[in-house]
Design a protein with these regions (language model features):
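Glycine-centered flexibility motif
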Residues: 13-14, 71, 156, 169
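A short beta-strand-turn-helix
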Residues: 2-18
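Residue-level signal for cytosolic alpha-helical hairpin/rod architecture
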Residues: 17, 68-69, 126
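Functionally engaged cysteine thiol sites
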Residues: 14, 74, 132
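C-terminal cap of thioredoxin/glutaredoxin-like
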Residues: 8, 22-27, 32-43, 111-186
Length: 186
């Protein structure tokens, strides 16, 4: 196996026994809504009671999904690790329409290049991502997220799991208190 000089920081917050896995696509409006609730969930349920694991679910109908997802993973290799990745997710969420296509097929992003998208994310997040994005074997981490989703039958975002089991009754539209109740139920 090839030795690498980089490490993608796992996108994990909290250290409790109940595990809440969330598969998100960074430009999906429903994923953005779910992402915006994760800090509040950790605060309400308690980092000693739950663990949140963020998984990335790139989806081809979100046309620049692969580029944006790779930017998130690239950010996780920087000094700030998962917090840098979270900053990229927050920047994309705050400006979601600037990373998406009109009706998944048109609009201003038709003329955008991957470098334009990276520069846009850098501008909004305040992070320099170019070198990390260009790590030759960074796709290994991208593929890990993809394989994890596939082996678990994840097809849409967001998808929520509690202790490894898909929970289709949980929605991005739910209140944080409802998520906490699901997680903390005996």
């Amino acid at each position: 196996m090839t030795q690498t000089s980089w490490r993608a920081d796992p996108l994990v917050w909290g250290h409790g026994p109940r595990v809440f896995e969330v598969f998100l696509e960074p430009t999906c409006p429903f994923s953005v809504r779910a992402f915006g609730k994760l800090d509040a969930l950790l605060a309400e349920a308690g980092p000693d009671r739950i663990t949140i694991k963020l998984r990335l679910q790139s989806q081809p109908w979100h046309m620049y999904s692969g580029v944006v997802t790779r930017c998130v993973i690239a950010a996780s290799t920087l000094g700030a690790g998962k917090e840098a990745a979270k900053a990229v997710l927050a920047a994309v969420a705050a400006h979601r329409e600037e990373f998406e296509f009109d009706h998944h097929a048109g609009g201003p992003n038709m003329k955008a290049t991957p470098n334009d998208i990276i520069a846009r994310i850098e501008g909004y997040s305040g992070l320099k991502l170019g070198a990390a994005f260009a790590i030759p074997d960074l796709d290994r981490e991208v593929k890990w997220h993809c394989k994890l989703a596939r082996q678990n039958g994840i097809h849409v975002s967001p998808t929520f799991l509690i202790d490894g089991l898909v929970r289709p009754e949980i929605s991005s539209g739910d209140k944080v208190s409802d998520w906490a109740a699901h997680l903390l139920a005996a």
